[in-house]
Amino acid sequence: MPTTGNYFHLHLVSDSTGETLITVARAVAAQYANVTPVEHVYPLVRSQKQLDRVLDEIEEAPGIVLFTLLEKDLVSRLEAKCQQINIPSLSIIGPVMQLFEAYLGASTAGRVGAQHVLNAEYFARIDALNYTMLHDDGQMVDGLEDADVVLVGVSRTSKTPTSIYLANRGVRTANVPLVPGIPIPHQLETLKKPLVVSLHATPERLIQVRQNRLLSMGAESGNETYVDKQSVTDEVAYARKLSARFNWVMLDVTRRSIEETAAAILKLYTDRQRQRLPE
C-alpha cells in the first residue's frame, strides 16, 4: 500500500464547496481504522489557473484523488495528470450523472454549484432549525402541535442531537424529557399532527453514558440516583409505561448512532406522511 507511515494523502477537488466530496471520502476512510487520510481540500476550482495549483500539490504529495468537476476540460486535464504520475482518480458524481442521463434521455445542465441554490428546501431547513432550538428540552410546549416530530425520553437518550440532525433535514423537531415524579406537559397528551417517538435504551447503556457525562463535567458525587441501577431501571419502566399509554412509537437507541436513529425516525415520518396522502 503506497502510504507513508500510517497515513496517506487524499486530494478532494471540487468546483463547488467540496462538502459532497468530504462526506463521501470520510465515510469510506472511516472503514480503514489502521490508516489515516491527510486531507487536501480544493474548493471552487473553476479555471485552468486554479487547477494548476491543485496539480502541483497532487504531484508533491501523491495519493488518492476524488473530484466533483463539471467542466470537461478540467476533468480531462486532472485525469491525465493522475494517469501520468500513476495515482488513482475518480469522479464522485460522474457515474451518477451518467445513470441519470441514460434513464432520463437528457444531458445535465452543467450548472456548477447548482445543489447549493437557495431554494424552498434550504429555507425549510432554516425554519426547522429555528423551531427545534426554541423547542429543545421541553421548552415552549405550547408550540408542540406545530412540530413534525416530537421526541420524548429519559435523560441521555440523545434527544437533542437527534432533534438537530432531523432539523438539518428540514424536519421541525421538538423534544420533551420524561422524568419520574414530574407530570408530562398536558400539551403532549393531546397531540394530533406530530409523530411522537419515544427513545429508549437499556439501563446499562444509560448508566454508561451518564457516568461518562458526569466524568466530563468533573462531577464525582451528589448524583448517585442519576446512575443508580434501580433508579435508572425505574425511569426506563416509567417511560415505557407512558409510551404504551399514549400509543407513542417506541424506538430502541441502545446500539444506534445519532445518524441511525435519525434515519429510522425519518422512515417512520415519511411512511406516516405517505399514509396520509389522499387516494
Curated annotation (Swiss-Prot):
Q: Which domain of life is it from?
A: Bacteria
Q: Which residues bind ADP?
A: 153-160
UniProt xrefs under InterPro entries? Kinase-pyrophosphorylase, PPDK_reg
For this chain, one GO molecular function annotation is: protein serine/threonine kinase activity
One of the Pfam families matching this protein, by short name: Kinase-PPPase
Under catalytic activity, the entry for this protein gives: N(tele)-phospho-L-histidyl/L-threonyl-[pyruvate, phosphate dikinase] + ADP = N(tele)-phospho-L-histidyl/O-phospho-L-threonyl-[pyruvate, phosphate dikinase] + AMP + H(+); N(tele)-phospho-L-histidyl/O-phospho-L-threonyl-[pyruvate, phosphate dikinase] + phosphate + H(+) = N(tele)-phospho-L-histidyl/L-threonyl-[pyruvate, phosphate dikinase] + diphosphate
Q: What class of enzyme is it?
A: transferase
UniProt KW keywords: Kinase, Nucleotide-binding, Serine/threonine-protein kinase, Transferase
Enzyme Commission numbers on file: 2.7.11.32, 2.7.4.27
Q: What does this protein do?
A: Bifunctional serine/threonine kinase and phosphorylase involved in the regulation of the pyruvate, phosphate dikinase (PPDK) by catalyzing its phosphorylation/dephosphorylation.
The entry sums up its family as follows: Belongs to the pyruvate, phosphate/water dikinase regulatory protein family. PDRP subfamily.
The protein's name in its UniProt record: Putative pyruvate, phosphate dikinase regulatory protein
